[in-house]
C-alpha cells in the first residue's frame, strides 16, 4: 500500500464494535503493534519517534521539526483540550501520524473548536491507540528511531508483509531536504504576537526593531516571540 500523498481526504468510518484491530504499526525491524485506529483511514510511512509532553499535542503535530515523523505520545490523555485554528506552529501538520496509549479523550476546553480526531481526519492524519507506548519508547531509546508504517483501516484487514516491506524500503530522513517541504512558499510580513487569554486574541506591539527572518521551517511561536520583543518582522523564504 503506497504512502498517503495528500491528494485527497479519506473520511474514517465509524469504529467497529468488535475487538478486531483497526490499525497497525509495523516497524522496519519486523516489530508489530496492533490497536484501534482513529483519525483518517490512510497509510503513512515515516520515522517513529516519541514525545513526553503532557500538553501541546496540536503544536507538536504542526511543528516543522517533526516533518517526516510518526509521533508516539507517552502521556495517556491525548485529546483532552480538543483542537482549534489558533494553536498551529505552521499552516499545516508536519508530522505523519500519531501513536497513543488510549483513544483520544473528549475535549473539555473553552478554546476547543473540534475534537482531536475530527482535526486529524481534516488533515489526513492516521492514528493508532491501544499501543504499549512505554514498550515502544524503550524500543526507540535502545535501538534508535526506526522507520515505521502506520495503517488505519476500519475493516481491520492488513497485509502485514507488504507493510513491513514498505517500512524497510523507505530511505529514511537522512539526506532528505525537509526544509523545502516545511518552508513558506512566499515572502510575508508577520504581526501576530503571543495569545492573550483575557482578550482572546493575539497581541501586537509597537515595533522598535526591523528584523528580516529567513524561513527554513520556522515555528510560528518563534515569530510571535519576536513580535513580543518589539520587532517589525518580515519573512523571506529559501
Regions found by a protein language model. Give the residues of each.
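Generic start-of-chain signal for non-secretory N-termini
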Residues: 1-29
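Feature captures the catalytic cores and cofactor-binding loops of soluble hydro-lyases/lyases
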Residues: 18-22, 28-159
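Flexible inter-domain linker/hinge segments
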Residues: 20, 140-210
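Class I S-adenosyl-L-methionine
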Residues: 121, 224-227
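Short active-site oxyanion
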Residues: 124-127, 208-212
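Glycine-rich phosphate/diphosphate-binding loop of Rossmann-like nucleotide-binding domains
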Residues: 214-216, 220-225
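A generic structural motif
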Residues: 230-233
